[in-house]
């Protein structure tokens, strides 16, 4: 029996236990000679046919597809694999890893990083890290790729402590990319930001860095729900007055965020912080043109509330405060206009 005949027999009879010993016994030259045979098997068993009166599907059984997939990983070049296969099943590659790793696996993985479907069925953070540690993958995945897989474990504090690199490096990638982090709250019994709060409280994540990154994330071109989620993380950690004063540059940067909810969250904090002697009045006043340019009434009202407090407490800044408030006179809201006029009449010269 030729090797072509034996491969056909294994596939036709669904002899799953026989395929790996068969592949292990092939020389490099024999693998190449099997390519035309495998091409025909791919075409035959992947063809959609009518299975019964009301059902259509591929001609091959799940076991036949597994046999073909394993064979493809061993004998195909990257070009041939792309032509015949949509992706790699991680559990199938794991069957081969003890004795064989496709030479092109790094290239295939890298290509997948730039696509919506990464090219691997069943890939997750655990498998990814296992492959890196085993040398299956010799490249370094992009931070966005790592974050995309890690986010699915954000409610498992035990798992997140399994590898030092997870908390030391990888968890910070979640502040940089949209991975649906805000949806993790739905799986933590109403405890928002559970893992972040847990690791901060236990000293395993630097508290000031978490606070700072949550503010920086708001302006990282994320969708409005996720931007609000990060702003909410900052307030959920109950930053002290001293922490807020230290992070004033990052706090003020949020005021120019493209979404209104994070802006209002921060304005709510500033209503209390603005009376502190170390509050950077001039830096805040430089943001008022952006705040009054918003078409959201609540932003105008919150900004005016802060300006009123500042005018009352900081006599040396009253002229500048009144000029800043005057920018809001273009508002279409009569209540906003009247409050501005009252502020100027009260504190202006």
Positions of predicted regions on the chain:
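Hydrophobic residues within the alpha-helices of tandem HEAT/HEAT-like
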Residues: 230-238, 266-275, 292, 304-312, ...
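Residue-level detector of extended alpha-helical repeat arrays and alpha-solenoid scaffolds
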Residues: 227-230, 263, 300, 337
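Alpha-helix initiation and capping sites
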Residues: 15-16, 31, 204-208, 223, ...
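Flexible loop/turn segments at the boundaries of HEAT repeats in alpha-solenoid HEAT proteins
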Residues: 203-204, 237-245, 273-281, 310-319, ...
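Amphipathic alpha-helical interface segments within eukaryotic helical scaffold
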Residues: 235-241, 245-278, 285-290
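HEAT/HEAT-like alpha-solenoid repeats
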Residues: 8, 212-220, 249-260, 285-297, ...
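Non-catalytic protein-protein interaction scaffold segments in large eukaryotic complex-forming proteins
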Residues: 1-199
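Eukaryotic acidic, Ser/Thr-rich intrinsically disordered low-complexity regions
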Residues: 3-5, 322, 326-349
